[in-house]
UniProtKB/Swiss-Prot annotation:
GO terms for cellular component: cytosolic small ribosomal subunit. Keywords: Ribonucleoprotein, Ribosomal protein, RNA-binding, rRNA-binding. One of its GO terms (biological process) is translation. This is Small ribosomal subunit protein bS18. InterPro entries: Ribosomal_bS18, Ribosomal_bS18_CS, Ribosomal_bS18_sf.
Length: 92
């Protein structure tokens, strides 16, 4: 079969499409996200503090990842441990 040539398949202008997109340009500003549980006056992570634990759980009862909640790695481990303890004691 003979191949068909598509119209409009040629590049228009000297710049490629990738150069025009802003997502491929480096980010000028980098903001550091602070952990909400490491700040001064932050509540202590405890398996009895159910109101705090429910903030870091989905509606289905799964533990939310730290990339969504902005929690540090150390506090994420404490959170997951206390959520699991609260589940075992049927507090959640």
């Amino acid at each position: 079969m003979p191949s068909k040539k598509r119209a409009g398949n040629k590049k228009k202008g000297s710049q490629s499409n990738f150069a025009k997109l802003s997502i491929f340009q480096p980010n000028k500003y980098k903001f550091k996200k602070t952990c909400p549980l490491s700040a001064k006056g932050a509540p202590e992570v405890d398996y009895k503090n159910i109101r705090l634990l429910k903030k870091y759980m989905s509606e289905n009862g799964k533990i939310l990842p730290s990339r969504i909640t902005n929690v540090s790695q150390k506090k994420q481990r404490e959170l997951s441990l206390s959520i699991k303890r609260a589940r075992n004691l049927a507090l959640i």
